[in-house]
A protein has these predicted regions:
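Catalytic cysteine-centered active loop of the rhodanese-like fold, especially the PTP/DSP P-loop
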Residues: 67-122
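Glycine-rich phosphate-binding P-loop
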Residues: 101-103, 144-165
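Conserved nucleotide-sensing/catalytic segment adjacent to the nucleotide-binding pocket
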Residues: 165-236
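Positively charged, proline/Ser/Thr-rich regional signature most characteristic
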Residues: 15-88
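Flexible, polar/low-complexity N-terminal or interdomain linker segments that lie immediately upstream
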Residues: 1-36, 64, 133-141, 145-149
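A short glycine-rich beta-strand->turn/loop micro-motif centered on a GG-aromatic cluster
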Residues: 94, 116-130, 172-177
Length: 354
């Protein structure tokens, strides 16, 4: 029997050594957040965990443990039959639950008695979460940041994608958050991660970055949709050198009509989101936008959204929060196309190399 216990810090340093990372918590807990690359083998599923918890409160711990053990044994047997039967002798799994207790302990004990070299995460997910929160500021502080600024529709995301495609280091917070970071930024069909999940995604994206090379990041606000950017990252961004991406208004409108095509295809959804802006622009102005959109005049509304709402708010935020924005290097692609962004990215990287 081989069963080893490691601290969260040790596990993080050795994650690459495990053949599988097994989360023994319920599917609901797993969905909220989990270790990178983890698979979910619930010792108790959502309903079972709720029922056992009720038994604990309404009867007593002994009866709850008996019932829980019976359910857990069946579930572990099912996982072994489905997932473990064909594993080789040298398979090395890591297992964890909420606090590294009974759920992952039972699974780990059985796997180790089979003959596998099993590692148990001491303190479980709770310890991992604490380690991630502690580690993010350290990782952020080791990196050299280049902040891509620019008004809405200037192509910041396209430029980041072009930079990444050409080998640059990029941290795309909007991609991690499944949100385009504005009142109209929700992406249909894509739910945002929980705050804990977002933190883990950011942390995991930071880990492989090379401290000797700059990292490009968009000038995000403190929140991207419903999730908050780690404070240490916000602070680092606001003190780092900036690039100011500039496009003519007509190009910005064209880009937004492409990237937000789902609004054009679902006018009522667009109108629903526009109504949120009544608080900021007034009911009369928004009513005019709604009428224009429903009449098919979308481009003029987008133009007014930029000049009357997004641009003033964005520029005020940049000047107030990003200390080096005033001295930002202005960069201008020839147009809003992907090809133009690729060309601009190439120029930027060439300039960095010289």
């Amino acid at each position: 029997m081989s069963l080893t216990t490691l601290s969260a810090t040790e596990v993080i340093a050795r994650l690459h050594e495990f053949d599988s990372v097994i989360d023994a918590r319920s599917e609901g807990e797993f969905e909220e957040d989990h270790l990178p690359g983890a698979v979910n083998w619930p010792t108790l599923n959502n309903d079972e965990r709720r029922d056992i918890g009720t038994l604990y409160k309404q009867v007593n711990a002994f009866e709850a443990k008996k019932r829980g053990a019976a359910i857990a044994a069946r579930n572990i047997a099912s996982h072994i039959e489905r997932e473990v039967i064909n594993k080789p002798r040298d398979w090395k799994p890591l297992a964890y639950c909420w606090r590294g207790g009974q759920r992952s302990g039972a699974l780990s004990l059985i796997l180790s008695q089979i003959g596998f070299r099993v590692t148990l995460l001491e303190g479980g997910y709770k310890a991992f979460r604490a380690a991630v929160v502690h580690d993010i500021p350290r990782l952020v502080g080791t990196l050299e940041w280049r902040v891509v600024c620019g008004t809405t529709g200037s192509g910041k995301t396209r430029l980041l994608q072009a930079l990444a495609a050409q080998g640059a280091q990029v941290l795309d917070l909007e991609a991690l958050a499944n949100h385009r970071s504005s009142v109209l930024g929700a992406i249909p069909g894509l739910a945002q991660p929980t705050q804990k999940r977002f933190d883990t995604l950011v942390w995991n994206a930071l880990r492989p970055l090379d401290v000797t090379r700059p990292v490009f990041i968009e000038s995000e606000s403190k929140k991207v949709g419903n999730v908050s950017v780690p404070p240490s990252l916000i602070e680092a961004m606001r003190q780092s050198p900036c690039l100011n991406l500039v496009l003519p208004d007509a190009e910005r409108v064209a880009l937004l009509l492409e990237d937000y095509a789902f609004f054009v295809q679902d006018i009522e959804h667009f109108c629903e989101r526009l109504q949120v802006l009544a608080e900021f622009r007034g009911k009369v102005v928004v009513a005019g936008w709604l009428a224009s959109v429903r009449a098919g005049n979308i481009a003029p509304v987008v133009q007014q959204l930029l000049t009357q709402h997004y641009d003033p708010v964005y520029l005020q935020s940049m000047q107030r929060n990003f200390l080096r924005f005033e001295n930002a290097k202005v960069i201008s692609p020839s147009d809003h196309s992907v090809a133009a962004m690729n060309s601009l990215a190439q120029q930027l990287l060439q300039n960095l190399a010289t």
